[in-house]
């Protein structure tokens, strides 16, 4: 449950406000001087009226002069209805802000061509952060105030009212003083929060103060009591001008465009010297939408886009490294958890630490208040559930596939020339296993030929009901001729399905062929290894990539072109950029022995897992010269040069056996067995023996093409994939957005825990509290109603944006009527009602959002940085649009649009003076003794928040005095 912990001075301030409002609402007399000056007609304006006027939507509650008890009842009804409408506005504003978050999160892919010709692709946000904060974000947080002003003017025959403008000024005062006071106070003692984009804050603060100064000018100086068309239009056009100025400050344009600062190291240690000079030429080209948008960096907005791209790349890399670090820590901390649980924890932790927009905090605050739960925890849990459910769905789909698929178990088979036959397995998966399936097979020549290397084979395989695999055999022909490795193919074709089979296996009926088909692989490749050669030994490929998480990597040493005899093949690991000795891998060496007819041997090397997001290190595995352990007697004799033999004293077939020993690196085997009748080292070989010797030499084991394997250790594919998926899931637009109406209705009727305990790193959802249930049932009507709003998935959020702002406008019209009727029922003027009650009601969600942002965010921009910009936007849009429409309407009718300058001009002037004090204090707090706009030592916090609350109380107090004519206004 989200609790707004207010400092004592703030809570006491709210009580004083209520007391002041009630006090001035029941003043029955005015001072003699004031009454003499104003006369009887002004007395009614000073004291307020108990006679209500017809609203834009709501009619007058008759009779107009009820009893005291009826007044209390009516006031209660109006007040409760107004509060309930505020809840509705908060919930639809939640949808509205979600659409804004999705809209401003849109990205565009660009191609960057570097001077060396290398091209890279990256994405940049379409919306600049500052521009989005001053336009859509400000509109989202201030939509009720802006629309109230427009609706009030348009709904009352284009005449000026007190409710809309006073709400804008009152809301600005509440934001500037109370929200900032709360943000200063809630930061833990000793911690500080600074504004990151200080230039933007200066610009928006200046425009905020100028906006209210401009209001005073057009009300009391330029044309007192009359708003002309040019004044209204200029007020509105100040809005885009303000946005452009803020964007310029954010992008460091203008002066920065022409002056390039360079930095060099001074002679003194630690000294950095700055000097100005020409910007170096750059030929980095950026291609967007197929067009080169700049050929030189200095010709494109001071390289703003290049800087943004570079910053984005750095941010992405930093995010990946941070995600990898978090996953590694969580795996060490929770070794018992499954990967889905670890992903959920990491997702929640990263989302909690990520810098968030004003829109997100507004949405989070609203959902916590209304029992919709912690959006981050819900998102993390939903993602974990989706991952598990998708896995189950895929498994179920595989098991319940309505189509029978026929395919080979594997696509490649190997056999020796002397194996006799090779067995191939055909599989049946999916479909109705109660039927009989037929499939034809047929061999086809490759480099191996039928009749000389293998037996041509064709036929039909029958899968009877319940059978899921069958085996076919193809005969292999052996010869004594040395040959290269050869291969041939076996194809599957013509799948048929039948329900009945005769006793002799003949198909009785053939139907429903659409429920069976060939799967993959439907062709098998059989490789025949020659067995008349000792073998050629090689790795499969010269380079292999392995994941650092593989643990024990296995490398195959292949024996091709023969497999006769026992052969020893030595190997060893060699360091490259990867280090042995257990740092990146463990040093390994050995001498595996290939047995007769054995064609594959596996070498195992242990790889050390560092769990790095990016890794690219290499080492090598090298095989040495193969050594023949045993050969046929005749070939052994022919392989060795005659001479230097040692008589063993043994005989074979009546002939003596000799042995000759060579060094380890000699190409001839170390030990051979020879047979000779009459040994003569000078005896020449016959031509037949020479031919046999040549053939035997060809059959000697040799090394093949790939004797040195380069092993590239890369980051874990699974680990990197998990990190990348989490990076995508940590897009806040995905967190706050919705994909379907079904999702919205489920969310609307679901109660979730509103606990805002972000220290709980588990990120797991908790059970809802009693407060969560109460708030849910109070707001379930609004939740279900606004679930009909289009999801943010449609039109990239614009459909939700349009419908939401229409709903906010409708509710705002009700709020304006209820507030006006509430005020006239108890005798409060519209200006006082707007400044106190309406401004407070529209600012409550922003108050909670700022409080959460102040405690969670690293900087103060999200909590108070947008307050000044929002205040300026309120004037330029809320008053600028409304007064422009009214001024144009009256000018078209030959009339003047009259606005009483008294109360509004006084409030504006008072607010402007206090705003100067507020901004000055905030800037002073950046001094080293405090360290930032928010937080700091406890004494400084209390003094600052007390001062700001006092400024707000004084603003309410003096505005009320002026409204009831106790002090003279303008």
Swiss-Prot record:
<feature type="binding site">
    <location>
        <position position="417"/>
    </location>
    <ligand>
        <name>Ca(2+) 3</name>
    </ligand>
</feature>
<dbReference type="GO" id="GO:0006814">
    <property type="term" value="P:sodium ion transport"/>
</dbReference>
<keyword id="KW-0677">Repeat</keyword>
<keyword id="KW-0813">Transport</keyword>
<dbReference type="GO" id="GO:1901660">
    <property type="term" value="P:calcium ion export"/>
</dbReference>
<dbReference type="InterPro" id="IPR051171">
    <property type="entry name" value="CaCA"/>
</dbReference>
<keyword id="KW-0915">Sodium</keyword>
<comment type="similarity">
    <text>Belongs to the Ca(2+):cation antiporter (CaCA) (TC 2.A.19) family. SLC8 subfamily.</text>
</comment>
<feature type="binding site">
    <location>
        <position position="715"/>
    </location>
    <ligand>
        <name>Ca(2+) 5</name>
    </ligand>
</feature>
<dbReference type="GO" id="GO:0005886">
    <property type="term" value="C:plasma membrane"/>
</dbReference>
<dbReference type="InterPro" id="IPR044880">
    <property type="entry name" value="NCX_ion-bd_dom_sf"/>
</dbReference>
<keyword id="KW-0325">Glycoprotein</keyword>
<feature type="transmembrane region" description="Helical">
    <location>
        <begin position="872"/>
        <end position="892"/>
    </location>
</feature>
<dbReference type="Pfam" id="PF03160">
    <property type="entry name" value="Calx-beta"/>
</dbReference>
<protein>
    <recommendedName>
        <fullName>Sodium/calcium exchanger 1</fullName>
    </recommendedName>
</protein>
<feature type="topological domain" description="Extracellular">
    <location>
        <begin position="819"/>
        <end position="821"/>
    </location>
</feature>
<dbReference type="InterPro" id="IPR001623">
    <property type="entry name" value="DnaJ_domain"/>
</dbReference>
<dbReference type="GO" id="GO:0044557">
    <property type="term" value="P:relaxation of smooth muscle"/>
</dbReference>
<dbReference type="GO" id="GO:0055001">
    <property type="term" value="P:muscle cell development"/>
</dbReference>
<feature type="transmembrane region" description="Helical">
    <location>
        <begin position="72"/>
        <end position="92"/>
    </location>
</feature>
<feature type="transmembrane region" description="Helical">
    <location>
        <begin position="202"/>
        <end position="222"/>
    </location>
</feature>
<feature type="topological domain" description="Extracellular">
    <location>
        <begin position="223"/>
        <end position="228"/>
    </location>
</feature>
<feature type="topological domain" description="Extracellular">
    <location>
        <begin position="963"/>
        <end position="970"/>
    </location>
</feature>
<feature type="binding site">
    <location>
        <position position="479"/>
    </location>
    <ligand>
        <name>Ca(2+) 3</name>
    </ligand>
</feature>
<feature type="binding site">
    <location>
        <position position="486"/>
    </location>
    <ligand>
        <name>Ca(2+) 4</name>
    </ligand>
</feature>
<dbReference type="GO" id="GO:0005509">
    <property type="term" value="F:calcium ion binding"/>
</dbReference>
<feature type="binding site">
    <location>
        <position position="612"/>
    </location>
    <ligand>
        <name>Ca(2+) 5</name>
    </ligand>
</feature>
<feature type="binding site">
    <location>
        <position position="417"/>
    </location>
    <ligand>
        <name>Ca(2+) 1</name>
    </ligand>
</feature>
<feature type="topological domain" description="Cytoplasmic">
    <location>
        <begin position="189"/>
        <end position="201"/>
    </location>
</feature>
<dbReference type="InterPro" id="IPR032452">
    <property type="entry name" value="Na_Ca_Ex_C-exten"/>
</dbReference>
<dbReference type="GO" id="GO:0086036">
    <property type="term" value="P:regulation of cardiac muscle cell membrane potential"/>
</dbReference>
<feature type="binding site">
    <location>
        <position position="611"/>
    </location>
    <ligand>
        <name>Ca(2+) 6</name>
    </ligand>
</feature>
<feature type="binding site">
    <location>
        <position position="453"/>
    </location>
    <ligand>
        <name>Ca(2+) 4</name>
    </ligand>
</feature>
<feature type="binding site">
    <location>
        <position position="532"/>
    </location>
    <ligand>
        <name>Ca(2+) 3</name>
    </ligand>
</feature>
<dbReference type="GO" id="GO:0030506">
    <property type="term" value="F:ankyrin binding"/>
</dbReference>
<feature type="binding site">
    <location>
        <position position="483"/>
    </location>
    <ligand>
        <name>Ca(2+) 3</name>
    </ligand>
</feature>
<feature type="topological domain" description="Extracellular">
    <location>
        <begin position="33"/>
        <end position="71"/>
    </location>
</feature>
<keyword id="KW-0597">Phosphoprotein</keyword>
<feature type="modified residue" description="Phosphoserine">
    <location>
        <position position="389"/>
    </location>
</feature>
<dbReference type="InterPro" id="IPR002987">
    <property type="entry name" value="NaCa_exhngr1"/>
</dbReference>
<feature type="binding site">
    <location>
        <position position="483"/>
    </location>
    <ligand>
        <name>Ca(2+) 4</name>
    </ligand>
</feature>
<dbReference type="GO" id="GO:0060048">
    <property type="term" value="P:cardiac muscle contraction"/>
</dbReference>
